[in-house]
Structures are given as C-alpha cells and as structure tokens.
Amino acid sequence: MSQDSESFIRQLFKAFTDFSTDVESLRGFLTPDYRQLVDGRELTLDDFISHAKALRTHLHRLDINVQQIVCQGNKAATVHIAHAIRSSGESSRIKVIAFYSFKDGRISLIDELTYVLEGGNADRELGSVQ
C-alpha cells in the first residue's frame, strides 16, 4: 500500500484542511477503532471528529505542507508543517512529526509530536484542541 498510502495521507490532509468539507466525511479515512496520540494525549475517532470541528471553529484557515513522507507496507511517516490562521488574523506554524498505521485500507493509528515554530502558547494545544 506504499504508493497508495502516500496518496491516502495527502487526500486526508486535503479533506481535513478544506473547511467546506463535511467533518463527518473524515470518518471514511479512519478505522472505527482509530487512535491518535498527540503530545501525550490520546484521541479516539469521535475525539478526532470533535478536534476537527473545534479547529474549524477557532481557525479561519489551515494549510498543511508535507516536507517528507516515507511509506512502507502498512506503515507511513510524515514531517509536515501546519500553518494555522485564526479568525483574529493571528497565525502560527507548527512542525509535526507523525507515524501512521493502516488497517483494512484506512488509518488505524497516528502517533505524532508537534513543535510550535511560530506562534503563542495557545498554539501548543492546536494538535488536540476539542
């Protein structure tokens, strides 16, 4: 699934950052038992959907620039930069290092660490805001 994994991750990022996309459609990318580990916090599938909704409430725009991606079998890893613009106009850039596991053609796990490159203290919570 290596080539497909890269395409799949890029499609997920596109849907995740397109705020006109129905948030519930993101479930199609993830397994029912999905888990996301973000800076020591654990999110379930429902938590992830709540997270996506919260981002759409707090942000005007979100862009993700994939800097590196490696895929092998049912595993993948990315280094990407999330550029968030709040409704107030403030912006932040967050570096994300993420590991992915796939099961049954969907993502079952994302384990990620984030680092705020530009922004304030509140931006540290953007990776798991509810």
Swiss-Prot record:
GO function term, MF aspect, one: cyclase activity
Disulphide-bridged cysteine pairs: none
Source organism per UniProt: Schizosaccharomyces pombe (strain 972 / ATCC 24843)
Taxon lineage: Eukaryota, Fungi, Dikarya, Ascomycota, Taphrinomycotina
Protein name: Uncharacterized protein C11D3.04c
Origin superkingdom: Eukaryota
GO cellular component entries: cytosol; nucleus
